[in-house]
Amino acid sequence: MAIKLRLTRMGSKKRPFYRIVAINSETRRDGRPLDFCGYYNPMVEPVEVKIDKEKVEKWLERGAEPSDTVKSLLKANS
């Protein structure tokens, strides 16, 4: 079972809001996650990002691989 850190879409139509989640790589985009690790709101100025670094580090130690977008969010907020 490969674990990924990726975004899952929330919010309403044309007002996206994303949660950063740890999820099985075979699960659909909005499927049931293993853990919530933060959120990303691109619709406000400035862009709002909150990441629980302890949870992210825990999942990275367990072998989770971040998606490209999550990787760039982690780099910007470190």
Curated annotation (Swiss-Prot):
Gene3D superfamilies per UniProt: 3.30.1320.10
InterPro entries in the record: Ribosomal_bS16 (IPR000307), Ribosomal_bS16_dom_sf (IPR023803)
Protein keywords: Ribonucleoprotein, Ribosomal protein
Pfam families reported for this sequence: Ribosomal_S16 (PF00886)
An example Gene Ontology CC term for this record: small ribosomal subunit
Alphabetized GO MF terms: structural constituent of ribosome
Family: Belongs to the bacterial ribosomal protein bS16 family.
NCBIfam families documented for this protein: S16 (TIGR00002)
The protein's name in its UniProt record: Small ribosomal subunit protein bS16
Species for this entry: Maridesulfovibrio salexigens (strain ATCC 14822 / DSM 2638 / NCIMB 8403 / VKM B-1763) (Desulfovibrio salexigens)
Gene from which the chain derives: rpsP
